Amino acid sequence: MYIKLFEDNPNTRDILKVVEVLNAGGIIIYPTDTIYAIGCDINNVKAVQRVCQLKNIKPEKANFSMICRDLSNIAAYAKVNNEVFKVMKRNLPGPFTFVLPATNKLPNVMINRRKTIGIRIPDNYIVMSIVEELGNPLLTTSVKAEDEVVEYMTDPELIHEKYEKLVDLVIDGGFGQNV
């Protein structure tokens, strides 16, 4: 499936379709404030395992991040001291990932050997609308090939061509930032 959304005003019906796919255990590709990302509901173990297969990584070795809806949502999944909270408050939403110690509320399949989790609150209304409607964080991992940023990671039509048989939904939110 392929859905075109406008970042400034994503269609609510389309956001609900995306959440329906996620609730059914689907994997999506969506825009962030940097490049496009692959994601799923962090509470769906099978979906997380599918993302691991797609990225050809073992869950215990994965360095996954998740997108939270706001700073108050983070404390349930990561240990945040006052200093880190102040830094996050100054810099989020934005193109940053904060790697923090994981709490035991994080699903086991998301916890790596170092027991850390990357936390993001991107400055992108599409993905933030999805997370808000989903009601819990979204697993996020970059759409990239061997740590090399290439055109297909920022062009939603090329992403769709490459991944349409591997994921359940690609969201076209315009060209990515290639950051």
Specify the residue positions occupied by each region the protein language model found:
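Active-site-adjacent structural elements in enzyme catalytic cores
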Residues: 1-179
